């Protein structure tokens, strides 16, 4: 398992390599998705973000394209995938067909009961604007969610990616902030550092980098 120093150095190197992209992303988001325009220019919550806009043409166009892609590719109201086995002979078995249909139905139900549709829409907005998106899925958060799984479209400023020799993304590092309270909820009290433990009792809203 890679240690902290190795991971830190690799993230720093990836951050240097993507520096020129960050300027482009910031400019695009300023005009197309200002609510996410926190790549190079960091703003506080509630601060005005539309000072460079002439009108909402770019924002509207991005929303329409993202909605069209979602409705076509991952519609919340229409089936958009089915399941089959590699063995075609088994696929002809009626019992196997019924099992696969039931499994697909359970998956659809799970998607529609969670925040999948909200977060996948954010993913399409990112793809249509800056051309890169990361949809993260994990187990529901330790007693705080009842959905079983939880989705999160990561902000472009949070993560660093690298491709394999075949051009496929095989590495993703993420840097993000959590309050002390959120960190304890996410990792458990015994799994966070002493500073976070202390802050969770005295200053639960104080933020830490992870």
What feature does the model see in each segment?
Residues 1-209:
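Extended, helix-rich architectural segments
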């Amino acid at each position: 398992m890679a240690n902290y120093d190795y991971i830190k150095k690799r993230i720093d190197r990836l951050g240097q390599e993507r520096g020129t992209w960050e300027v482009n992303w910031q400019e695009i988001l300023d005009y197309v998705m200002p609510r996410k325009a926190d790549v190079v220019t960091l703003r506080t919550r509630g601060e005005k973000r539309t000072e460079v806009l002439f009108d909402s043409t770019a924002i509207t166009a991005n929303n329409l394209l993202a909605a069209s892609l979602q409705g076509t590719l991952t519609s919340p109201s229409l089936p958009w995938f089915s399941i089959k086995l590699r063995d075609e002979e088994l696929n002809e078995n009626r019992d196997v067909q019924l099992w696969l249909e039931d499994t697909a139905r359970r998956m659809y139900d799970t998607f529609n009961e969670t925040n999948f549709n909200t977060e996948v829409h954010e993913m399409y907005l990112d793809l249509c604007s800056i051309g890169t998106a990361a949809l993260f899925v994990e187990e529901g958060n330790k007693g705080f969610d009842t959905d079983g799984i939880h989705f999160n479209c990561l902000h472009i400023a949070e993560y660093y990616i690298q491709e394999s020799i075949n051009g496929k993304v095989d590495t993703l590092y993420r840097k993000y902030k959590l309050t002390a309270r959120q960190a304890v909820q996410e990792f458990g009290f015994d799994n966070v550092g002493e500073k976070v433990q202390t802050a969770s009792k005295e200053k639960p809203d104080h933020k830490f980098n992870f």
